Structure formats: structure tokens, C-alpha cells
Amino acid sequence: MDAKNVWVANDDGSEIIRAREIAGASLDYDGNVTVRLTGGDGSAVTIAGHRTHHEGSRPDDFHRQLIRVISELSDAAEAFLVRAVHDEARGWRWATEVL
């Protein structure tokens, strides 16, 4: 997977990382999605966290959904930004936008 043109933002948009730097993704018991970055320092970034009660639970496979979206976008000619969003009708999902 060569995701050179795919970027992932945390839910408030204050951090954006290049998707190809993601070594792994995890979902903790609170529903936070954290990605581990490649490189020797083992850095980790929480990209979906701190939800409120009215937003409900994130799907049990939300971290896998992120990897699937990145994989699907990895061959695209355009650059994309991926971020977690919540709406009342659809619940939690990964939204993409062209950069």
C-alpha cells in the first residue's frame, strides 16, 4: 500500500499525519482510535478520541475501517484527507475530502 497522497487528521483537526507513516491502528475500551507511527521512536497519535455521550459508541471495527479507507485511497491520483466524523443518522464513520 503506497498512501503517499493520503493524510489522516485527528477529530479536532489539530494534527495531520501522512497515512504511509502509520504502522498500526488500535481501538481501546473507551473507543479511542490510536495509530502507531513508523520510525524508531514508536510515536502514537490518537486520531479519534474524547467523544461525548450523545455521540454514542464507535463501531468495534472502527480502526479496521480506517485502514480499509486508506487502502482504498492509496492508488488515487488526488490527495485526500481522512477524518472521523459523527452524525445522528449514520453514527461514526470515516469521511474523506479531496485536498
Model-derived regions: residue spans:
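Eukaryotic intrinsically disordered, low-complexity regulatory linkers and tails enriched in Ser/Thr/Pro
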Residues: M1-I16, R20-L99
